[in-house]
């Protein structure tokens, strides 16, 4: 009965707002399924991407059957998250399942057409079968997790260090065969992607900030976002006070030392050390550790209730939803100027609109501009357009994004 209530409530929460606008990364996922066949994804698209191909291949197969609406694109992530809840129930009971089912960050990413919900499911399945000592399945799911998201490697690494401390050397080998095989299979692609990543870090001014440097701010955000999700509000000091106090309360609940606490800490520690050399310390890249956090905590009704409140605040308030590209595109004409590589949402919602890179030569007297992502590339839109004789005449704001209109000054 308890499990049924948890599953139903968890599903209902995830279905609210599932048709909200896609944001940039989700639009990339959608356009990959439109423009590449399932076999072209690893052979063509993935060479210019920074993720392994398995999620995109799964999504391509899914959309061929279910279509590519916002709801359809996100439904696999919903399903993966529901499987995660059930597996955690098998491992820790209804209380732990409630923590995972209601966790606001897991709710948010279970509504996203990206690979994070999928990799969370694969890793918790691997951990479940590790407990059962069924190593074939451990290797299968750990291997698949690497082919879904490279950052998944930190959990098997943390588990391996834990086993090393336990002097279970043979078991370390037993759980890493599949992961090693996946790394070898994917190595040619990974090498190419690493080269491309280094080039991007050199060419794009602030790209390392997107990836997530190893610093106290990004580390602190992991502990806050793991407990309160993606919601944020002004004034910021009030937000950080409320979210910070809640985070302290939750994390105190898992101070007790058990194997899950140790595995969580070791896995996160490996990720932090790795991020010193290759930036990737963003909280959403570690959400697969939230089920481990829940197992470390055990069933805590008050915490589960708090998680549910934060999740409801998110799903019932559209101000906390993703960037509203859908509404923005409805206001566009036949052409828009922006950083061209960030144009996937425009192409998803209206492929007839021409996306022109704002850094090129502009000859029109009146232009529509989306400044989104310009700062990452070190582009100051006002300086760039002002230097060409343009002046901003109008600005329309949508959720987290804006549309600007610029005209030659002599026409104003």
Residue ranges and their predicted role:
Residues 1-5:
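N-terminal membrane topogenic signal
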Residues 10-407:
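Membrane-proximal helix-loop-helix interfaces that form the catalytic/acceptor-binding platform
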Residues 411-412:
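Short, solvent-exposed mixed-charge patches
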